[in-house]
């Protein structure tokens, strides 16, 4: 059946019906199979507990109020995360240079013979940044060209460490990092970063951290991240609201957005400027 001429939203639904769930992998998108990309009606029955029996003496970055917001609202925004203009500029330059040197690849969904691409669904270019257990970038050639990005990743590791040190039984498994560049006209349709269940506790993304480095971004440039705020993790919310509530988060430089990977749907609105640069680290 040829569905190439159908509207994008119809193609999405058809692809969702004929696809089979698959586990996350480094070559796929943040929604790693067609089913996860399309079928956004799934709701997990496993909650992410970020506020019980906290070891408050280990707080360095967060406090009880911020963790409560992350658990109940599902997201947290930290502006001026690095608060270092020189570092921000260097991270921007390193990121864009990776793109200009053709180190990024066009993003797609799924992998192998099942991999598919459609810029009307997802239009970014990506590069995976792999670090070892000692927080060293595994690719030595890459390491020498993104020293300031690695500095940022060290700072994001401190957040992961604080989750482990403050929240009993958080027990992070690993992190995964991706550099993404969108050009003018690029977008990414509504999706979740993972689906959380008792059978996949060790393979699911739990926390998404997105760092933006878009200098001189202004209203009208597009590329906002539309975050849908119906949060199934909120135990006080007896049932999800039928109306879709959302906030549009501006991708301004030195802004860090943190949200619950399995629960909050989101999309990248069409970019009217380029490059739109985001560095995402997921905590498993």
UniProtKB/Swiss-Prot annotation:
Cofactor list: Fe(2+); L-ascorbate
GO BP, sorted A to Z: cellular response to hypoxia; culmination involved in sorocarp development; oxygen metabolic process; SCF complex assembly
CC per GO annotation: cytoplasm
Fe2OG dioxygenase domain segment(s): 169-284
Residues bound to 2-oxoglutarate: 276
Xref: SMART domains: P4Hc (SM00702)
Family named by the database record: Belongs to the P4HA family.
Keyword match Iron: yes
N-terminal signal peptide: none
Cofactor note: Binds 1 Fe(2+) ion per subunit.
Keywords: Cytoplasm, Dioxygenase, Iron, Metal-binding, Oxidoreductase, Vitamin C
Major subcellular location class: cytoplasm
Protein name (record): Prolyl 4-hydroxylase subunit alpha
Function statement: Catalyzes the post-translational formation of 4-hydroxyproline.
InterPro entries associated with the record: HIF_prolyl_hydroxylases (IPR051559), Oxoglu/Fe-dep_dioxygenase_dom (IPR005123), Pro_4_hyd_alph (IPR006620), Pro_4_hyd_alph_FE2OG_OXY (IPR044862)
Catalytic activity, as annotated: L-prolyl-[Skp1 protein] + 2-oxoglutarate + O2 = trans-4-hydroxy-L-prolyl-[Skp1 protein] + succinate + CO2
Subcellular location: Cytoplasm
E.C. numbers: 1.14.11.-
Activity regulation (record text): Inhibited by the prolyl-hydroxylase inhibitors alpha,alpha'-dipyridyl and ethyl 3,4-dihydroxybenzoate.
Subunit composition and interactions: Heterotetramer of two alpha-1 chains and two beta chains (the beta chain is the multi-functional PDI).
GO molecular function: ferrous iron binding; L-ascorbic acid binding; peptidyl-proline 4-dioxygenase activity; peptidyl-proline dioxygenase activity
Binding residues for Fe cation: 191, 193, 266
């Amino acid at each position: 059946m040829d569905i190439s001429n159908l509207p994008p939203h119809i193609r999405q639904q058809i692809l969702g019906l004929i696809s089979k769930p698959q586990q996350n992998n480094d070559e796929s998108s943040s929604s790693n199979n067609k089913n996860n990309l399309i079928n956004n009606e799934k709701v997990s029955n496993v909650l992410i507990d970020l506020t019980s029996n906290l070891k408050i003496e280990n707080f360095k970055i967060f406090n009880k109020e911020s963790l409560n917001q992350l658990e109940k609202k599902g997201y947290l925004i930290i502006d001026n995360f690095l608060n270092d203009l020189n570092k921000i500029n260097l991270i921007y330059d390193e990121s864009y240079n990776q793109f200009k040197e053709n180190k990024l690849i066009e993003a797609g969904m799924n992998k192998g013979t099942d991999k598919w691409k459609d810029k009307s669904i997802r239009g970014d270019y990506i590069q995976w940044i792999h670090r070892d257990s000692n927080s060293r970038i595994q690719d030595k050639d890459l390491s020498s060209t993104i020293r300031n990005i690695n500095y940022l990743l060290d700072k994001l590791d401190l957040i992961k460490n604080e989750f482990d040190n403050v929240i009993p039984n958080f027990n992070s498994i690993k992190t995964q990092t991706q550099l993404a560049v969108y050009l003018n006209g690029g977008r990414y349709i509504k999706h979740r970063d993972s689906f959380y269940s008792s059978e996949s506790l060790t393979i699911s993304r739990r926390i998404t951290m997105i760092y933006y480095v878009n200098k001189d971004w202004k209203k009208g440039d597009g590329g906002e991240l539309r975050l849908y705020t119906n949060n199934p993790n909120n135990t006080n919310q007896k049932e999800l609201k039928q109306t879709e509530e959302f906030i549009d988060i501006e991708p301004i430089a030195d802004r860090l957005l943190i949200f619950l990977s399995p629960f909050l749907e989101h999309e990248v609105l069409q970019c009217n400027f380029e490059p739109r640069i985001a560095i995402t680290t997921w905590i498993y």
